[in-house]
């Protein structure tokens, strides 16, 4: 769902044409899971907005045990009780967005006083036995990312991802654009981060295709070279069941509805096929930054 208890400066969903649709109920989401299983889709990520705002989250995770399951969250509602329930429902991993080890910086970027709750949520998830990672969208305000990694390690986190700012939603507004790192600045941040992560025994991945050349990322020692997976390795379902190319691609391209259209029709949709063909080139680009987005939306 896209309801949220934060107002992040770089939110990919905020202000999007499909950002205010009506949510499916519990029974409908369970039907979605059945259809995804029938299509042999191996992994489901519960994301948002903020998925922990749904009272049926544990029930849905429990219904999704056939899949590899992941939860993307800001962590603020990960109480000891909810963390334990998610663990018992066989949630495979949880990714918490942590912008900074500094409360003032984190709070400025999420638009609310949420740092304490997020840190508590990370601690609770770790204590419950969940596999926990942090994700950090990088910008000029939190470029001291190495400190955030040190802090996360002190909380018991051993996995981290970071990204550039996806040009979608609020991240296209003047306030967000003003904080974007240049390629050289991003390279400097990643160089320090890779070194610190290695010293802490953490696994670190950079997940944004197209921000830096492949040779630069390999030279930094990053093991994952990101490439666009839209309509190829991942797709997304909006709160009303509409299928879109990826969770950030909410500007008007719709590929069908998972509850009313057969999966084969969605998968073979001409728009889906065109986007997938671009993804399959493995050119390490983000299609939200290329002309293919405009062509698909035309």
Residue spans of the language-model regions?
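Radical SAM enzyme [4Fe-4S]-AdoMet core and its adjacent flexible, acidic
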Residues: 19, 88, 99, 104-227, ...
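Flexible mid-to-C-terminal extensions adjoining Fe-S/redox cofactors in radical SAM and related proteins
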Residues: 218, 225, 242-298
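The −1 position to Zn-ligating cysteines in a subset of zinc-ribbon hairpins
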Residues: 3, 7, 227, 285
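Conserved, mostly hydrophobic/aromatic
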Residues: 4, 46, 96, 241, ...
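Conserved alpha-helical substructure of the radical SAM core
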Residues: 1-93
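Processing junctions and N-termini across compartments
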Residues: 2-5, 222, 280
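Short Cys/His-rich local motifs and their 1-3 flanking residues in nucleic-acid-associated proteins
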Residues: 6, 13, 233, 248, ...
